[in-house]
Amino acid sequence: MSGIDPKRFGKVAVLFGGESAEREVSLTSGRLVLQGLRDAGVDAHPFDPAERPLSALKDEGFVRAFNALHGGYGENGQIQGALDFYGIRYTGSGVLGSALGLDKFRTKLVWQQTGVPTPPFETVMRGDDLAARATDIVAKLGLPLFVKPASEGSSVAVLKVKTADALPAALAEAATHDKIVIVEKSIEGGGEYTACIAGDLDLPLIKIVPAGEFYDYHAKYVADDTQYLIPCGLPAEQEAELKRIARRAFAVLGCTDWGRADFMLDAAGNAYFLEVNTAPGMTDHSLPPKAARAVGIGYSELVVKVLSLTLND
């Protein structure tokens, strides 16, 4: 596909592991990315920032990094800033796009100001009177609701709440993961979709049909009964328009090159964007490899394409 001489990439670090709640997912992603790059002839090496100082990247002559870290400092702009400081090119978004992309609260604020549709929501701060806030939120948003920490990925600590009585406990659980908790109106009727973005590749939308209540951590990385529908079943014109909106939702946050934008459709077919992911999972359960495979792009070819985006000015 790319016709790129792998020697152009130089010495490449595959960053994976880290110290976030998503460490295990990152370890799986990183090992597969490493193998995919090596299969293509890239001089790629494993690098876990939880075990080695980042300064070793410069000391050991790395010129490029494939970021397979998920959550925490790997996705919130910190690693990106350090790599900028060391002059090492890296996959995915820069400091601003990464920081905003991991912060669901500020993502939604930007979307509200730029016309990207997103579900109505309220925020709860750690230390708030949870019972009082729960009563107020149910009155404003109704039920069911989704409760999620503002800055965790992979659906860590995301809970669906169907009754008012269950909301305070869900808020308390989410607040153990983040000082800001998002409470979002559940969009029902049309299903959940993701748009995978990888440079100029035209990847199909994926409709996600979990066997359980929603697409949680277990459905993403453990269960084998989640259905991923490609093609997604939408009319071609609607799919093209949703992909256009997804790219805009990604771009207005300052996100670049590669990632995902997740959204729900209501019963009338209206889209509501939930979040972006600037360092998507690359496990055998993950969505970008599935979307690429559907259009004839294998795993190794996909990771080389993503890495090739670091060659652009």
Curated annotation (Swiss-Prot):
Class in the EC hierarchy, top level: ligase
The keyword Cell wall biogenesis/degradation appears for this protein: yes
Protein name as annotated: D-alanine--D-alanine ligase
HAMAP family the UniProt entry points to: Dala_Dala_lig
Annotated Pfam families: Dala_Dala_lig_C, Dala_Dala_lig_N
Lineage: Bacteria, Pseudomonadati, Pseudomonadota, Betaproteobacteria, Burkholderiales
Gene: ddl
Named cofactor requirement(s): Mg(2+); Mn(2+)
Residues reported in the UniProt entry to bind ATP: 138-193
Keyword Manganese recorded: yes
GO BP: cell wall organization; peptidoglycan biosynthetic process; regulation of cell shape
Purpose of the protein: Cell wall formation.
Functional pathway: Cell wall biogenesis; peptidoglycan biosynthesis
Organism: Burkholderia orbicola (strain MC0-3)
Residues reported in the UniProt entry to bind Mg(2+) 1: D262, E275
Domain of life: Bacteria
EC numbers: 6.3.2.4
Binding site for Mg(2+) 2: E275, N277
Family label: Belongs to the D-alanine--D-alanine ligase family.
